[in-house]
Amino acid sequence: MSAREVHIDVNNKTGHTLQLEDKTKLDGGRWRTSPTNVANDQIKTFVAESNGFMTGTEGTIYYSINGEAEISLYFDNPFAGSNKYDGHSNKSQYEIITQGGSGNQSHVTYTIQTTSSRYGHKS
């Protein structure tokens, strides 16, 4: 077990496949389970872990939707300090609900959905 880990669930509720972009990166650590495309109505789990003495893991996963919208999912589990998570879409019709935990072996769930789905109807 690594000193720091982030178990990342990506829950796709967009109606489209999330296409992994090449600019997905780790600023610290390594992938134990690398990100991949995520089909609609699927949940995929990826794991990033620290790789070295007194280090954490940090990175951003980038997805595109139909080559139009871009989704970014940021995570940081530092060796010292608080964990941070953030999700962002460059198109207002998609939102990211981020639920992240604390601790050295943390878990975060990013649910990517159409903005209207929170009101019980699809666009």
Curated annotation (Swiss-Prot):
Listed A to Z, the keywords are: Sporulation, Toxin, Virulence
The residues forming a coiled coil are none
The free-text biotechnology note states: Expression of the 2 toxin genes in transgenic corn confers resistance to WCR and has been commercialized.
Q: Which GO terms describe its biological process?
A: sporulation resulting in formation of a cellular spore; symbiont-mediated hemolysis of host erythrocyte
Q: What does this protein do?
A: Component of a binary insecticidal toxin active on western corn rootworm (WCR, Diabrotica virgifera subsp. virgifera Le Conte) and probably also on northern corn rootworm (D.barberi). Both proteins are required for maximal toxicity. The larval midgut epithelium is probably the primary target. This protein alone is also active against southern corn rootworm (Diabrotica undecimpunctata howardi Barber), but its activity is synergized by its Cry35Ab1 partner. The 2 proteins individually and together form ion channels; channels made in the presence of the 2 proteins have higher conductance.
- According to its UniProt record, which protein family does this protein belong to? Belongs to the aegerolysin family.
Identify this protein by name.
Insecticidal crystal protein Cry34Ab1
